[in-house]
Amino acid sequence: MKKAIVSSLSFCLAVTSFMNNAEEQKPKKLEDVQFLSITYTDFKHGKTDRAMEIIKNHYFPASKKAGTQVPYIVKFQSGEWDMATLWNLKNGYSSMEWEVTEEGIKWLKAFNKQEGKEKSKEIRDEFNSLIQRSNHVIGYHPTDIE
């Protein structure tokens, strides 16, 4: 019984404290940040080199030809993931409202022109077949940190 009373009292104090702070708070938008879309990728055993070959020899050249963003790639030497791909979300979270982006369309057109429509599909299918699993997150980098 004593534990129940102490727990209830602690909860009430925490809620009251939160409510007081909520009344004092004002909306605040994040400033000086760069929003990022980050994909962690784990390739099937022995397939990382082929995946990197496709990225360097096919995907990056198409990005450059299309004038679209070339992602920042991090290859891990430890941990559960083989690679992280980071994309700058130029329009912040609102970039995620698009099912198909203008930049994505430009890239695919350049990739199809570079490889041929049928070959481009084969390359994309092959790349996807190399992936064991992946995870996608959104975050931000404070740009006022040097």
List each language-model region with its residue ranges.
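Hydrophobic pocket/interface hotspot
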Residues: 39, 51, 85, 95-96
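An amphipathic, aromatic/His-enriched active-site/gating alpha helix that lines ligand/cofactor pockets
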Residues: 5, 27-30, 57, 61-72, ...
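Sec-dependent signal peptide cleavage junction
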Residues: 19-35, 144-146
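Bacterial Sec-dependent N-terminal signal peptides
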Residues: 1-26
